[in-house]
Amino acid sequence: MTKPQPIPFGKSDLFSLGVEVELQIIHPETRNLFPISPDILEEWSLQSPHLKPEVFQSMLEIDTPICKNVQEVEYELLLTSRELLRICKKHGARLASNGTHPFAKWHHRIFYPSDRYEYLLERNQHIARRLMIYGLHVHLGMKDGDHCIAMMNEFLYYLPHMLAMSASSPFWTGHDTGLASSRITVFEAHPAGGTPCRVENWAQFEDIVQKLTRSNSIGSFKDIWWDIRPSPNYGTLEIRICDGVPGIRKTTRLVAFIHLLAKHLQKRLEQGIRRQTPDDWMVRENKWRASRHGLDCEVLIDNDGMTKNLREDIKDLLAAMKEDAAEMGYTEYLKQLVEEDLTHPSYEIQRALFEKTGSLEHVVDSLCDVFEKDLDVV
């Protein structure tokens, strides 16, 4: 058997942060998606190249440089978002950052001209055409490949927590899906997407990538779209399960939670305390429960099938991380997360507004308003 080809793991500072936010471009009159990303990209004026095209021309991605903490992440996202919104307004457009557009039709979308996207379309056909979804991706700097895999396994239990806290996609193509996150059901249809394979060390990850590549299942490890995955080029662990979160302030509160959780799990590893790695069935079941019921779900807490209310599990976790939060300057972020985000999740707000108005256009307006309010744009 051929020995797996080594995959170099990049250098990064431990728990450095990089954040990617996928955005919807909205037409202010129709409230539908607005395919003008080439025009916006042509006019981009900031020196830092932290605005990127995405698979459709009605979609853009903003990302941060490497940051030390959430305060830096917030500053960078606000800076980029304000400039982007200025250009969008010039072109008669608005922005939203939640997980799905409430009523747009995927078969009306226009692909961005790119060899990468043409490859995805040819390879994945219907699955690629439906990628009208918007996520939040968080990169965490790791020591090395083995450390990255160890942390990935520690994070597996908390995937439903992050999905439920971000869930913002109850509507899809004009219908109430009955889910808190419909985006994740579209995302996991990708042939190398969804729940990660069980991996114990970096050598096993290299072996999986080699076999997938040899069998022409993927072109490179970039085609592995797991909910959480190593990102060797950056030397990071990338968390990809989250829906896009409405507004930059709420986004940074969730990033603060994730960053704090990483440091909490690292302390436990150093103390020799490791949570039992959840079985594959448990990871999948918890993901489904969070997708369906959001923060109201009963999450499985062990491989024996014991359950606990997810909101309570999150609050207990926050209590355990209270001292670290104070040390990192994250106390106010987490206070607002509990008082606002855990109390009034986006999927509930959107549904309540639709029930009150009967208009998905009003839902779109409210999501754009949230994005602009966070930027102090009148």
Curated annotation (Swiss-Prot):
It catalyses: L-cysteine + L-glutamate + ATP = gamma-L-glutamyl-L-cysteine + ADP + phosphate + H(+). Keywords: ATP-binding, Ligase, Nucleotide-binding. Gene3D superfamilies: 3.30.590.20. Coiled coil: none annotated. It comes from the Bacteria. InterPro entries: GCL_type2/YbdK_subfam, GCS2, Gln_synth/guanido_kin_cat_dom, YbdK. Pfam families: GCS2. Its EC number is 6.3.2.2. The keyword ATP-binding applies. One of its GO terms (biological process) is modified amino acid biosynthetic process. GO terms for molecular function: ATP binding; glutamate-cysteine ligase activity. ATP-dependent carboxylate-amine ligase which exhibits weak glutamate--cysteine ligase activity. Belongs to the glutamate--cysteine ligase type 2 family. YbdK subfamily. This is Putative glutamate--cysteine ligase 2. It comes from Bdellovibrio bacteriovorus (strain ATCC 15356 / DSM 50701 / NCIMB 9529 / HD100). The lineage of its organism: Bacteria, Pseudomonadati, Bdellovibrionota, Bdellovibrionia, Bdellovibrionales.
